[in-house]
Amino acid sequence: SNDVIFFEDMFQPGIESLPYIIQQSPEQYRPRIYLRCLAQAIDPDDFVHVWGMSRWMSLYEQMCNEIPNVHILATNEEMVAHMRIANWKAPIYNISGLSYGKAEVLERVKKIKPFEQRARRVGFAARWDQEKQPGFFMDLIEHWHANKTLPSVEFAIFCGGPLRSNNPVYVNRAKMMEQAGALKIYENLKKNDYYELLNDTRVLFNCALQDWVSNTVSEADTLGCNVLFPAYRSFPETFANDETRMYVPWSGRDAMEKLKTLLSKPSPNMGRISDWTDGTIDRMIDIMTGIGEQWRRDGRHYRNTVSESKY
């Protein structure tokens, strides 16, 4: 069949009915199934290990691999490698990014604020959970404030609801630091409020152990905000190996040195990350229509493309 069923997320309730139905259908009526993979039980830093969910989730992944006519859309090269290690037999493609609409984000702000007019603010937009290493961020803040030769900076946490964590130690420490004037917590932000803050922020900072291609990096890059992420996991691929916007994991010294530069001027590569992720949906459609075979990664030479800049 030329029909295609696409699942935006492989971990979708109801997907377990597919193999039961397809297996009973004649071959000529079987659609091709495309599953986009956003997370994996093999990831040692994923929250599924915190909550003990990995035992059943790895079995669920095996089921997905056995669905007739299934094709896997991985979001980066490292995720592909994990699937190959696990001996997945389904065709695997690297779509190299999350689904993202740059124009939709730009429509939510009236005008991009010039960099030099922005508040000297460093934002943190990941979950405040232990796998995002909020302790590393708070350590960096304390070291920054302790060095009196460094400029005054507002360090901020951006939250869509109240600040919460899978480890309350991080919430307690953050609130104590806010009381001391070391950081500011922005809570219960609507999407447009968050974008307005990004549009008045100079650097978005990330130090996550568990993160693949985060939409926060595309949003900040779209709205004229510098981004500083660890050279870890999929971020070298996302950043096209741009060493000026990535720091050595987990060097606080290197992060602070890069942060000083990114607070002072916009990156010359600003906008390129979001331009690339803006094309992710097109790459998926190319794959599903048979013209994206350059993204296939289940052959012998699948690791040859890891170090190549994607744009």
Where are these regions (language model features)?
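Active-site proximal beta-strand in glycosyltransferases
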Residues: V4-D9, Q23-F47, L73, I95
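Membrane-proximal helix-turn-helix segments that form the acceptor-binding/catalytic region
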Residues: V50-I72
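Donor nucleotide-sugar binding/catalytic pocket of nucleotide-sugar-dependent glycosyltransferases
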Residues: I67-K111
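Conserved donor-binding/catalytic core segment of Leloir-type glycosyltransferases
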Residues: K111-H143, A156
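Glycosyltransferase donor-sugar binding loop
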Residues: V153-V171, E187
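Aromatic "clamp/platform" in nucleotide-sugar-dependent glycosyltransferases that forms part
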Residues: A208-Q210
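Short hydrophobic beta-strand element within catalytic cores of glycosyltransferases
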Residues: N226-F229
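A charged, aromatic-enriched C-terminal amphipathic alpha-helix characteristic of glycosyltransferases
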Residues: W250-R253, E257, T261-Y311
